Amino acid sequence: MSLPRFRLVQGKAIGERSTPGVSTPEPAPPQIKQEVDYQDAHQMAPEPVEAPQAQNHQMQPPRQPIQQQMQHFQSPSPMAPQGPPGTPQNSAAAAAAASDDKNVTKCVRFLKTLINLSNNDDPEMPDKAARVKELIRGVIYLETTAEEFTRNLQQVLKSQAQPHLLPFLQNTLPALRNAVRNGTASVEGVNPPPGYVFNNGRTPGPPQPPPPQQQSQQQPPLEMRQIPNPNQIPPQMVQGGPHMVSVGARPMIRPMGPGGPSPMGLQGPVRGPMGHQMVQMHPPPPPQQIQQQHPAPPVEMEVEENLQPTAAATATRQYPEGSLKSSILKPDEVLNRITKRMMSSCSVEEEALVAISDAVESHLRELITLMAGVAEHRVESLRIPENYVAIDDVKRQLRFLEDLDRQEEELRESREKESLIRMSKNKNSGKETIEKAKEMQRQDAEAKRNRDANAAAIAALSSNKTVKNKWENTGAATTAPRPRTVRVTTRDLHLLVNQDSRFTGTFIREKMSYGGPAVDTTI
């Protein structure tokens, strides 16, 4: 009986069709097809463009409203209100004003206490109170320095030097002088000198009675206004007391127009000495006397009356308080030195004085800057500048060699230990070899414990901060170093004088040349 024969035939897999389909080649990728189309298009003859233009004309109407809508949303409204910009300067100015007011209050309280303490009867010095008031008047109105005031006050009161008094006065006196000049502060019992001029132009005079109730409502002072007709009502200013203002070369004049006379105004500009214009302001008369006043006097009569009392006020320039803190030269001292060398009939114009002072100050500042640069180059180190990079470190190389020697020593010791341990395990080894191997194992275990304990203690006591080298922090991203005091020596000045051509033939160069180079023992 023969066994049936079977033939293995490949059947369908999961998801396949029962009848195998015809395999079709995959279509070419679109990029290849586009390339063929492009090549054919180059070979084709150009066609007329009337049809595409017609299509464009047909497609333009629906695009136009879309563009208009986009313009409608993108174009900002011309009438949109804009918010006020931020004013960080106003807050800083308010903080500075509050600090100045606080300094003024402290200084006034201190001066009042000083006057009260000096009023005590002293048989040895009966004029102590008057002398103290004179010192206070000088330091407030006559620009006496705080050092002179402190020294004279110690002599008058016969007291010891107070270390905190001079810094306090240097910090608070500028604010007090500014407030006194503006008329917002005063010290009881201390009157200004006769020639003192305030910022608002008024000069110290006898106290006036308070104005009536009808004049209580004050109006803000306006700028200079010119009255078109001298026969009109005289000018009025609500500020109490007669004022005398020294204005610059050309004041701003606002014409009042063809209307009636203004209740507030100033008389026409009057030519004064040195090209200045003197303007006189009068106190406001009562309302019932306005109709009975006579016409204003002509301008020529006022020039003769006001020329003498204002000569002292215009002789010197009034600088705002605090403007000369950073100045090397004070114009008042320069003016005094110039006038001493001139004849009594000569005068110094303000513009020339300011030009000389500014030129000399600029020259001195430039020389000081150059000398500071020379001193910096003299004392600078090679590690600090960013132009130098550390390319070799001898200490690190020595440390590396020491580490290599230590590793070789440890390797040699470990080999000896292994040989001893191997010999101790041999049955033929003596008792001394076994004891020596055990002792070495005990020492190794103790040394390992000590190393682990020391590492744990160092990790617990040390911080996480890593010490970086100085040259790693140099670069544009690092912060600027703190400004430090530069010590300029005579050697720096000698080098600058010899190199600068502006010192050729000057007295200082000849003096330093005859004296020879300076020797600094501290270097």
Swiss-Prot record:
Where is the segment annotated Histone-fold?
329-383
Compartments where located:
Nucleus; Cytoplasm
Q: Outline the extent of the TAFH domain.
A: 101-199
A GO CC term attached to the entry: cytoplasm
**Which segments carry the region annotation Disordered?**
1-100, 185-241, 407-435
Query: What are the protein's UniProt keywords?
Result: Cytoplasm, Nucleus, Transcription, Transcription regulation
Give the disruption phenotype, in one or two sentences.
RNAi-mediated knockdown causes arrested development at 90-100 cells and inhibits differentiation. The two E cell daughters (E2 cells), which form the endoderm, divide abnormally early, immediately after the MS2 cells. Phosphorylation of the RNA Pol II large subunit C-terminal domain (CTD) is reduced severely in embryos. Abolishes expression of a range of genes, including let-858, rps-5, hsp16.2, pes-10, cki-2 and sur-5.
Q: Which Pfam families match?
A: TAF4, TAFH
Q: What is known of its domains?
A: The histone-fold domain mediates hetero-dimer protein-protein interactions.
- Provide the family line: Belongs to the TAF4 family.
What is the protein's given name? Transcription initiation factor TFIID subunit 4
Q: What is the lineage of its organism?
A: Eukaryota, Metazoa, Ecdysozoa, Nematoda, Chromadorea
